[in-house]
Regions:
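Aromatic- and acidic-residue-enriched segments that line the glycan-binding/catalytic groove
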Residues: 16, 32-54, 123-143, 191-236, ...
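Short, solvent-exposed turn/loop segments enriched in Gly/Ser/Thr/Pro and often Arg
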Residues: 24-27, 115-127, 189-198, 289-294, ...
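C-terminal beta-strand-rich structural cap/linker in extracellular carbohydrate-active enzymes
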Residues: 19, 585-617
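Active-site-proximal helices and loops of the catalytic beta/alpha 8
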Residues: 175-183, 192-193, 201-208, 266, ...
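Loop/helix patches that line or flank the sugar-binding groove of alpha-linked glycan CAZymes
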Residues: 15, 30-85, 360-568
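Conserved, mostly hydrophobic/aromatic
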Residues: 23, 107, 117, 134, ...
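Solvent-exposed beta-hairpin/edge-strand motifs
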Residues: 563-579
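N-terminal structural segment of carbohydrate-active enzymes
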Residues: 1-183, 261, 268, 598
Length: 617
């Protein structure tokens, strides 16, 4: 297929008005125990004990089942490698599509209106970034795994061989149900690498240079029957041999022809599905894993193809680097906004290790590097499946090692496996106060907020795999979290659903949705005070102005609100992180608000209907 490379279309308008909710499917909700994964479905079942079983959803996370401890080697010097190497990655909890269907009302009640799914395609790992194919939803997320596996056994890259499995159909049912409730749906596209069980790689490994797929992967050396010493070796993503990398074309400007056509066919299948001869509702866009590791030409053509299929589709590239040029050159709608949002938030609001003025400078300079049309649709996340959870970042805020050059410490050794001093405890009241500040800032800043599943329910956890614990639910009673992977004593923690934190998330989300200025209005920071760790942020619309005041310090502070563009009348406190109705006092050139330590409040006021100077973007 020859693709045109047109100028990228503007990002869809809907993407500026959503609050994303990220779901890690295997850990969200087990709605159908009859389809639970089996030992044979695991990545390397021969190395998993016969007494393997589904892990109880509500158990103590660091407590290990008998099949896990059976793998421990006698005389191991410590217990940390045993927990992380022997068992936890082979755990399955049974999260599935039926579970998501059952909890759409929960998400609707929370107020989020867009769902981003981590990979849901057929794969053997728990995370599913090691796809076995991309044309099918994982059979163990649907109602008939055995039947689905039989149906797809002889498929190849030709779409004419592809069926619609029961899991595929259930996913499309979920998409339609989500659309009826006002959600947009984004799925993870892993087009950089596959798993070793991927149909093309299995054929390549078996047939070597005689394989039809010999040009699909980066092969370093072939196994030759005439040379018993020869070995089949290939490039794995970041050295992981479980994730063989798709090859580029000869001049490294594009994806190789074979995998490229396959990716295009998969893209069309899920954006514009036709089932039993009838069009069905498809997804609303893609999040692209490791997007900055593929040539720009491929993404430019792929993004143009996506828009030709669905003009209002949203595409979001994963990158942790400065991303403005990447988004513009490759044609994406946006990116996961680690560099321009999560990093500064970690530095000031969470760790309090950079001054307020630098926080403002980083946010302003990194935001303004993007096209103004891109900024409102950036995915403003703080944590994800690839980091420790927000709550645990806060618990461990004093551990962050900030280098002399002033760079921000983000996702570095944030787990027990690599940092023996990492604290796995439940957040306390002070930690939750900081979490509420972060959330209120996220919900009032420019860009689309992202909530990682369970953060709103009180979940905490270190870096992968500890950030991927089973979701806590109101109707489930969790065991006390009483085990420490280091084999030391621990005070039991209550992991059950946090209704108070949920209520705060819900109110902050509702406030954002109720005020259009928060989705597209300009941003102006007011009076950052480095010694007090205070600042304010002004968002201006045609009829109202909203100011967020933040005291990140450990003392009560009066925060002065003044700007040539602040023209409101009769401002009121709309929402605060401590639930108090703080008062605003007028002075000669603005307003004062007195905030306790670790508190933020949103002030809202109407403005005169007069010609106005809108100020900076």
């Amino acid at each position: 297929m020859r693709l045109a490379t047109a100028a990228p279309l503007p990002a869809p308008a809907w993407a500026a008005r959503v609050i994303w909710y990220q779901i890690f499917p295997e850990r969200f909700r087990n709605g159908d125990p009859s389809n639970d994964p089996t030992r044979d479905s695991l990545e390397d079942p021969a190395n998993v004990p016969q007494n393997w079983r589904i892990t109880p959803w509500t158990g103590d996370w660091y407590s290990r089942d008998a099949w896990e401890t059976a793998q421990d080697k006698p005389g191991s010097p410590d217990k940390v490698p045993n927990f992380y190497k022997n068992g936890v990655l082979d755990r399955r909890y049974g999260g599935d599509l039926q579970g998501v269907l059952e909890k759409l009302d929960y998400l609707h009640d929370l107020g989020v209106n867009a769902i981003y799914f981590n990979p849901i395609f057929y794969a053997r790992s728990l995370h599913k970034y090691d796809s076995s194919n991309l044309q099918h939803i994982d059979p163990y997320m649907g109602p008939d795994p055995k039947g689905d596996l039989e149906l797809i056994a002889n498929e190849d890259e030709n779409p004419a061989t592809w069926h619609w499995t029961s899991a595929d159909r259930l996913f499309l049912k979920l998409v339609a149900a989500a659309h009826r409730k006002g959600f947009h749906v984004l799925i993870d596209g892993v087009f950089n690498h596959t798993g070793r069980d991927f149909f093309a790689f299995r054929d390549l490994k078996a047939k070597q240079q005689a394989s039809h797929y010999k040009d699909w992967y980066v092969v370093n050396s072939w196994a030759k029957p005439s040379d018993p010493a020869s070995k089949f070796t290939y490039k794995g993503w970041w050295g992981h041999d479980t994730l063989p990398v798709f090859a580029a074309n000869a001049d490294n400007t594009d994806l190789a022809a074979g995998p490229k056509q396959y990716v295009l066919d998969v893209t069309k299948r899920w954006l514009r599905p036709v089932v039993d001869g009838k069009p069905a509702q498809g997804i609303d866009g893609w999040r692209l894993d490791a997007a900055d590791e593929r040539p720009a030409k491929f993404w430019t053509e792929w993004n143009a193809y996506v828009r030709s299929l669905k003009p209002d589709a949203y595409t979001c590239g994963e990158t942790w680097k400065p991303a403005a040029r990447f988004v513009a050159d490759d044609g994406f709608s946006a990116c996961m906004n680690y560099f321009a949002f999560a990093f500064p938030v970690k530095g000031f609001l969470i760790d309090a290790r950079i001054p307020a003025s630098r926080f403002v400078m980083l946010l302003d300079s990194r935001r303004k590097a993007f096209s103004p049309s891109v900024v409102p649709v950036l995915q403003n996340l703080v944590d994800s499946h690839d980091t420790d959870r927000l709550a645990s970042m806060i618990v461990n805020r004093r551990l962050a090692a900030y280098p002399p050059d002033g760079d921000i410490s983000y996702d570095e050794n944030n787990d027990v496996r690599n940092n023996n001093t990492y604290d796995i405890r439940k957040p306390d009241a002070g930690d939750r106060a900081i979490q509420r500040i972060v959330v209120l800032f996220q919900m009032t800043y420019l860009g689309a907020p992202v909530v990682y599943y369970g953060d709103e329910a009180g979940m905490w956890g270190a870096h992968d795999p500890d950030c991927r614990m089973p979701m806590v639910w109101k109707d489930l009673k969790f065991d006390p979290q009483a085990t420490d992977p280091r084999g030391i004593g621990r005070s039991p923690d209550d992991l059950n659903f946090d209704a108070h934190l949920f209520a705060f998330y819900k109110s902050a989300i509702a406030f954002r949705k109720a005020h259009a200025v928060l989705a597209d209005g300009p941003v102006e920071f007011l009076n950052p005070n480095d010694s007090n760790r205070t600042l304010a942020m002004l968002r201006r619309g045609d009829s109202e102005e909203i100011v967020l005041a933040i005291n990140r310090g450990d003392q009560p502070r009066v925060i002065h609100l003044s700007s040539p563009h602040l023209e409101w009348t009769d401002p009121q406190i709309a929402i605060s992180t401590d639930g108090s109705r703080h008062t605003l006092a007028r002075d000669s050139d603005g307003w004062d608000i007195n905030l306790p330590p670790l508190t933020a409040a949103v002030c809202q006021g109407m403005i005169p209907v007069l010609p106005r100077n809108h100020g900076p973007p």
